[in-house]
Amino acid sequence: NFVKAAEKVGFRADVVSRLSQEELGHYDALFIRETTAIDHHTYRLARAAEREGIVVMDDTQSILRCCNKVYLQDAFAYQKVPAPKATFVSSATDEVCEKLIADFGLPLVLKLPESSFSRGVHKAENKEALKARLEQMLAESALVLVQEYIFTEFDWRIGVLGGKPIYACQYFMVRNHWQIYNHQGDRFSSGGFATMPTFEVPKPVLQAAIKAAKAVGDGLYGVDIKQTGNAVYVIEVNDNPSIDSGVEDKYLGKELYELIMQEFADRLEQRGR
């Protein structure tokens, strides 16, 4: 789909699964469609592309910021992005647990600073579970993000490109599970979805998505938002959001891919390629 869209806006696109730094120099633009991480070849490739002056999405700044919940939390507070009440903890004493419960109530959501796609994310229903889970998580990370729990039937996922919303989905929770992804054991399941035009999305949801994306950069992001009544809460900003045939493209179809490829064309033009 992306290859056809690239042709339509006037350039040839190759799908590559591996790319050496020499080969990278033959291209004008790089679009990473693999889950990114900091200590990972995707980040190294993005950095190499930037050094070569190649237009790249996701850029290294976006990868660093999206993979870092400490940064996102601070940026949201500073830019006044509506988000769930949250704090970072570095110990799991009774005192810490009691204060968390007093401040945020129960259940609580616990996240590793570098978690994504519902992995490394846990829910604690009571003090014992909170203490046990915190101890376990602090064994692998110096900090754990603790958030108030907000129940909703679905999460909004707003795709934002260059500061503008381009697609909107509702991802529903997995049956009998509190997240949109369930990684129980070896089985992986995800809930249902609904895709709609961005003009049908409530205004506060779109505004929050644009504001949250701006705190990260001007690339392509998937912003996850919960809405209860008139209140909206940004849960996180994902670089490299999934764009699956029949899901995110269900409303716009081919146009979604063309919009993204056009962004590359525009950026190349700005650089005089």
Language-model features: where?
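Conserved N-proximal alpha/beta basic substrate-recognition cap immediately N-terminal to
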Residues: 1-85
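C-terminal active-site "lid" helix and adjoining low-complexity regulatory extension at the edge
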Residues: 3, 200, 214-215, 227-273
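A short glycine-rich, hydrophobically flanked beta-strand micro-motif that places a catalytic Asp/Glu
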Residues: 15-18, 147, 218-229
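Glycine-rich phosphate-binding loop of ATP-grasp-fold ATP-dependent ligases
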Residues: 72, 84-86, 108-133, 155
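ATP-grasp fold ATP-binding core
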Residues: 76-77, 101-119, 141-156
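Rossmann-like NAD(P)H-binding beta-loop-alpha module
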Residues: 84-107
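Protein kinase-like catalytic core scaffold
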Residues: 108, 165-167, 221, 233-236
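Phosphate-binding site of ATP-dependent enzymes
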Residues: 122-216
